[in-house]
Amino acid sequence: AYEIRPSLVGSEMCIRDRADAVTPAVLAYEGIQYQYLAPGIFSDTQWDYVNRHLNILSGFYGVLCPSDAVIPYRLEMQTKLETENATDLYHFWNNQLYQALYCKFEKDSPKELINLASAEYSKAVLPYLTEDVHCVTCVFGEFVQGKVKVKATLAKMARGEMVRWMAEHQIQTAEDLKQFTGLGFEFEESLSSGTEYVFLKKDICPED
């Protein structure tokens, strides 16, 4: 006969509880953009596409693939979190998120990055862009009084919708994004540039 120490039992139960809580990253998040991404109804082809092309930025984990196992957590990139060597998460991660993304590019192939992250997370990547990477940031808004006005909720919906659309149509280049018309948005050439694609609600367009 032998006796198991209570501390070991507690540790094992904790490990099992955490194992039960693990879920693929793209299914673990419940924000508006993920609701419109709707990964729960993906086809096998769509799953394959996002696993090859989609990267999720996390203040806790860093750069995640959609199928990476995670335990649900609450930690936003803007959270003040001082460590021994950093004053916040931007300082903590420094250029590591960009380097992780850069390593995913195939050697000697064109390097194109589609930025559908919020401004909060974009700040952790865009300052470190290298000259050999063409990055396009997508902006979703309405044209109000001569300016593009971005509404946070609508933009989140559109970002998720665009990723789902990209997976459905197997989009391969930034140029192909101009065909996106989800949620009533249309690409607006006159307000866009080579590094920023502006999509406006089609019933609210710039004056001629």
Spans of features found by a protein language model:
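Single conserved hydrophobic/aromatic residue that forms the stacking wall/gate
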Residues: 1-10, 15
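Generic detector of short alpha-helix boundary/capping microenvironments
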Residues: 1-2, 19, 45, 50
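Glycine-centered flexibility sites
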Residues: 7-10, 31, 59-62
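Active-site helix-to-loop segments that bind/position phosphate- or nucleotide-bearing substrates
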Residues: 11-12, 16-44
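Internal, well-folded beta-alpha domain core
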Residues: 39-193, 198-208
